[in-house]
């Protein structure tokens, strides 16, 4: 059976240490808080925030205090990176560099992927997440 019902990434979930740091970080990348809700987990309460930029949705969730220590000890969270398409990699690189983002590479990197190759760079988020721009 061929699975043909997957259309696109719906959202990317990132466990965060502190909403007060994470929300402004994603706002600086052009994301908007489109939903915020508390949730109950294991006798405590956490917070979930959906951040949206065009068709890209990032779910930031802060677990209750009891689970927060384990999340803070993670090096890269549950996902090691997620990628965002940009129109012009060089423009995005310079704009984010000028804005003071923590860019991992010194310049966009070329990989011989796909038919014509791809260029990308990565930004480190406040919770150890890596955001690839290509």
Which sequence ranges carry the predicted segments?
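Conserved short beta-strand elements that form part of the metal-binding/catalytic scaffold
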Residues: 34-73, 123-134
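Short, conserved charged micro-motifs
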Residues: 21, 90-94
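Vicinal oxygen chelate
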Residues: 1-3, 93-134
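Electropositive, surface-exposed helix/loop patches at the edges of structured domains
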Residues: 67-84, 94-101
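Structural motif
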Residues: 55-58, 79-81, 118
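N-terminal beta-strand motif that seeds the catalytic metal site of vicinal oxygen chelate
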Residues: 1-21, 79-84
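Core segments of cupin and vicinal oxygen chelate
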Residues: 6, 14-57, 98, 114
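Residue-level marker for the onset of beta-strands and adjacent loop->beta junctions
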Residues: 10, 46-47, 80, 119
């Amino acid at each position: 059976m061929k699975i043909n019902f997957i259309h696109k990434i719906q959202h990317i979930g990132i466990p965060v240490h502190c909403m007060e740091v994470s929300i402004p970080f994603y706002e600086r990348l052009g994301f908007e808080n489109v939903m915020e809700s508390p949730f109950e987990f294991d006798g405590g309460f956490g917070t979930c925030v959906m951040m949206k930029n065009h068709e890209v949705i990032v779910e930031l969730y802060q677990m209750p205090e009891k689970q927060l220590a384990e999340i803070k000890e993670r090096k890269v969270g549950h996902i090691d990176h997620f990628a965002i398409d940009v129109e012009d990699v060089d423009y995005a690189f310079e704009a984010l560099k000028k804005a003071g983002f923590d860019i991992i590479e010194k310049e966009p990197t070329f990989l011989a992927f796909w038919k014509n190759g791809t260029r990308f760079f990565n930004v480190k988020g406040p919770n150890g997440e890596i955001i690839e721009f290509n």
